[in-house]
Amino acid sequence: MKPFVAIIFCFLILGVDSQRWFQFMKEAGQGTRDMWRAYTDMREANWKNSDKYFHARGNYDAAQRGPGGAWAAKVISDAREGFKRITGRGIEDSRADQFANEWGRSGKDPNFFRPPGLPSKY
């Protein structure tokens, strides 16, 4: 049922034509994996002041997939930051995170936010 709803959503709201809906959904799935990978890398690195870098990197990687990836990155980022605002945790930090999210989605280099000393693995 959920894939069917997503497909209908793409047709009606996003204006994805019948030739591109499969590609859009594929990009969205890949973008979701990119966002998850950035999150797990952030947790694994556990590096001070690195969250903006991982936000930007996840959004950048997802957006590089195409319109579906950029859409998935925006939905995930907005949901995450919206949850922070609802719970009242760090409104200023949430704004900074959104700036990093938009920076990455726009195709700008996420290394702008890279903290000194972060291992090259990330």
Swiss-Prot record:
Major acute phase protein. It comes from the Eukaryota. Its main location: secreted. It is linked to Reactive, secondary amyloidosis is characterized by the extracellular accumulation in various tissues of the SAA protein. These deposits are highly insoluble and resistant to proteolysis; they disrupt tissue structure and compromise function. Homohexamer; dimer of trimers. Can form amyloid fibrils after partial proteolysis; the native, undenatured protein does not form amyloid fibrils (in vitro). Apolipoprotein of the HDL complex. Binds to heparin. GO terms for biological process: acute-phase response. Residues 100-122 are annotated as: Disordered. Residues 19-45 are annotated as: Important for amyloid formation. Induction: Up-regulated by inflammatory stimuli. Belongs to the SAA family. Detected in liver, spleen and kidney. Pfam families: SAA. It is found in: Secreted. Keywords: Acute phase, Amyloid, HDL, Heparin-binding, Secreted, Signal. It comes from Mesocricetus auratus. Residues 1-18 form the signal peptide. GO terms for molecular function: heparin binding. GO terms for cellular component: high-density lipoprotein particle. This is Serum amyloid A-1 protein.
